[in-house]
């Protein structure tokens, strides 16, 4: 179970060059490139939005805002950085703006958790319930770091830059989170 969070098997590997090309085409007004970017990155964007907003409906709504923002601002992307990092920074900034506006931090309800399509994470209902419990045992920032690494396949250095945290902090929080999750899962299995 925990090994699922330590791989990127369920998230497509970031192909930096192809994503850069898509962003350049989007900057030129290519709607097909936007559709392709959406297909390649939607799981990662949704996962990040859900980790901030903790509400499936709000995360889906914000996800649409992200791609509208990408369409409007694609010409601002500079191909020196990670295209996925740029996209997730857009998502993060929109999440933070929404949270500031709404000032709410509700827990992910069981109904909202179940709204996540099963095929997106490759788990059956029992495994999803265990994973939900393990993730709920984490602090918000720990959960966000684990999900960014597991869902998007981002490297810890990229997560540190995205969350504006020192790399050693991200690494320690990630490893502490995995220990907490392992402890939670071993407690349930006993």
Predicted regions and their residues:
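Internal acidic/polar
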Residues: 2-7, 12-16, 97, 104-133, ...
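DNA-recognition helix of helix-turn-helix
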Residues: 92, 96, 142, 151, ...
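Arg/Lys-rich amphipathic alpha helix in sigma70-family domain 2
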Residues: 72-79, 88-109
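Short helix-capping/turn signature of helix-turn-helix
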Residues: 40-43, 51-54, 137, 147-154
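Short, charged helix-capping/linker segments at alpha-helix termini
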Residues: 8-13, 27-36, 46-65, 158, ...
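Short amphipathic alpha-helical boundary/capping segments
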Residues: 21-26, 130-139
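Structural recognition of an alpha-helix C-terminal capping motif at a helix-to-coil junction
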Residues: 47, 61-68, 72, 81-93, ...
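Conserved RNAP core-binding helix
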Residues: 18, 39-42, 46, 56-73, ...
